[in-house]
């Protein structure tokens, strides 16, 4: 019989001084090699930012994203982490707006992370608990919700709704983002996860609403950054992958990148 999951197995993979609680879980007793990382972000300590890629999401409005973390002194000093966004436009044409610039319009019934003018964040479903509003300054949509108002989606058995690998595998590297009832964000990423297993990990981590982000090991990446003194006196940042089986490289998101992503800065 398969080994029972170790749940959770707390590890010190992330530098504790980053202030983002992190632990690992082995969530699938039938796949003891499946390991997921769970990272908590408190918006009282950190700001989350959205960047459109240089290629994706392929805009219907002619806009092209910068694809990189802004290279200014304040951002470099505050930069803590960055992680992957959602699917390419061809896989659903889910909405994306950055600083009131619409790359793809929002779709009803789709899981959405929205940024508001007062600085708050809300993760929910567009047209239900997130209504179109001039107060929304940015949003990223992706798929139907994994978790809505505390309930894991009953549709999660329909595998194709939440993505398959190129070889039609449903149990693959996946990532997702949740929001707890008190407003904290939870990022989860791991190998050999079904959409249902990902949703369960997010739920156990306290997510009241949650959405799928990108999938497969070519696209899932979480990078932490540390500040070092540059030769010219400017602050430089050095990236480190959270896991070596993530295909990204340590300098991910510091140079123009094709896909959308999120980055995290410490509130100054």
Where are these regions (language model features)?
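Conserved, well-ordered active-site substructure
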Residues: 92-109, 162-163, 168-209, 220-268
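Catalytic metal-binding/acid-base residues of hydrolase active sites
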Residues: 88, 216-218
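Active-site-adjacent helix-turn-beta-strand microarchitecture at beta-sheet edges
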Residues: 83-153, 157
